[in-house]
Curated annotation (Swiss-Prot):
Subunit structure: Associates with the mitochondrial ribosome large subunit; the association occurs in a GTP-dependent manner.
Purpose: Plays a role in the regulation of the mitochondrial ribosome assembly and of translational activity. Displays GTPase activity. Involved in the ribosome maturation process.
SUPFAM superfamilies per UniProt: Obg GTP-binding protein N-terminal domain, P-loop containing nucleoside triphosphate hydrolases
UniProt-listed PROSITE patterns: G_OBG, OBG
Protein name: Mitochondrial ribosome-associated GTPase 2
Highest taxon listed in the record's lineage: Eukaryota
Similarity comment: Belongs to the TRAFAC class OBG-HflX-like GTPase superfamily. OBG GTPase family.
Organism of this sequence: Homo sapiens (Human)
CDD domains, per database record: Obg
Length: 406
């Protein structure tokens, strides 16, 4: 019995050792291997600040006027190339038990045109590239298969785009839907079937496709609006546009704050919309390319009527109107004679009250006195703007044309 007891004691010792080793080994393992992984409570509990940070959409940063100027482009030099025509094929008909088949090479497809198309949703030439290549036509095939012609490539341009070539105006795209073929596609080549004749029953001649037309065009944008606000720098044109429309041009107390034209829409009853353009400030000698120069004077050409904005707080404000009309007349004959209204701004300033009576005496016409900052007398401007538009619309309908709609 002694050996049996000794064996059982040793066996018990071995089992105890194995048990201690198993417990120590399991304890040393990572919890992730033993238990299913659970999300950390920190990931599930989000504070109010963190929740707002994740839920709120990132707001769009307001661009300064200098940065906006990069997005508004009113001039582009464009190289347009029409698509090349496809080559004709030279092959013969092949059929069992027919040794001498006739020619069956098809013609190549024509190259695609490059066309300028006016799109009302486009407001600038910034999306126009400096080079365009039309789609080429496919080559002809056997069994009289003609190649597919290249698709037409459309270039979207804004309303009021002027197309020039070699200093000469070749197209004036002033209406929505207007199109102009900027470059013609090349003609497709002829297959050998085209050269089949009585004295040549097995022609092998085929011609390559013609290259597309290449042209260098200069695109100029002239902003199309019903009314154009004209004035000297810091006269309050941008503030006035912000007051009567939803446009948000930059406003500051220094001259030449506005570096590009802005167009605001004034809404009236009956879904009538009048477009008002804020033209950058004009100085004396602007027609000689001083200041911002004549680069922005051309935007006034398409305006149907004008609003001369005068800074009433400046000494002798009537001279501003005379100088503005002179600059417009020097730039283009008859531009200053368009229907217009005189808007005297900054009536809220003390020095403006003293100049009001003198301004009316010198001009001898109705003057709309208001303050774009405080909103004083803006209703009179809106009513007069409607009168100018009605006169313009009546004149257009009398000549059989539809008024410009935005």
């Amino acid at each position: 019995m002694a050996p049996a007891r000794c064996f059982s004691a040793r066996l018990r010792t071995v089992f105890q050792g194995v048990g201690h080793w198993a417990l120590s080994t399991w304890a040393g393992l990572k919890p992730s291997r033993l238990l299913p992984q659970r999300a950390s409570p920190r990931l599930l509990s989000v504070g109010r600040a963190d929740l707002a940070k994740h839920q709120e959409l990132p707001g769009k940063k307001l661009l300064s006027e200098k940065k906006l100027k990069r997005y508004f482009v009113d001039y582009r030099r464009v190289l347009v190339c029409g698509g090349n025509g496809g080559a004709g094929a030279s092959c013969f008909h092949s059929e069992p038990r027919k040794e001498f088949g006739g020619p069956d090479g098809g013609d190549g497809g024509n190259g695609g045109h490059v066309i300028l198309r006016v799109d009302q949703q486009v407001k600038s030439l910034s999306s126009v590239l400096s080079r365009y290549q039309g789609f080429s036509g496919e080559d002809g095939g056997s069994k009289n298969c003609f190649g597919r012609s290249g698709a037409v490539l459309y270039i979207r341009v804004p309303v009021g785009t002027l197309v020039k070539e070699g200093g000469r105006v070749v197209a004036d795209l002033s209406c929505v839907g207007d199109e102009y073929i900027a470059a013609l596609g090349g003609a497709g080549g002829k297959g050998n079937r085209f050269f089949l004749a009585n004295n040549n029953r097995a022609p092998v001649t085929c011609t390559p496709g013609q290259p597309g037309q290449q042209r260098v065009l200069h695109l100029e944008l002239k902003t199309v609006a019903h009314a154009g606000m004209v004035g000297f720098p810091n006269a309050g044109k941008s503030s006035l546009l912000r007051a009567i429309s939803n446009a948000r041009p930059a406003v500051a107390s220094y001259p030449f704050t506005t570096l590009k034209p802005h167009v605001g829409i004034v809404h009236y009853e009956g879904h009538l919309q009048i477009a008002v353009a804020d033209i950058p400030g004009i100085i004396r000698g602007a027609h000689q390319n001083r200041g911002l120069g004549s680069a922005f004077l051309r935007h006034i050409e398409r305006c149907r009527f004008l609003l001369f904005v005068v800074d009433l707080s400046q000494p002798e404000p009537w001279t501003q109107v005379d100088d503005l009309k002179y600059e417009l007349e020097m730039y283009e004959k008859g531009l200053s004679a368009r229907p217009h209204a005189i808007v005297a701004n900054k009536i809220d300033l003390p020095e403006a009250q003293a100049n009001l009576s003198q301004l009316r005496d010198h001009l001898g016409q109705e003057v709309i006195v208001l303050s774009a900052l405080t909103g004083e007398n803006l209703e009179q401007l809106l009513l007069h703007l409607k009168v100018l538009y009605d006169a313009y619309a009546e004149a257009e309908l009398g000549q059989g044309r539809q008024p410009l709609r935005w």
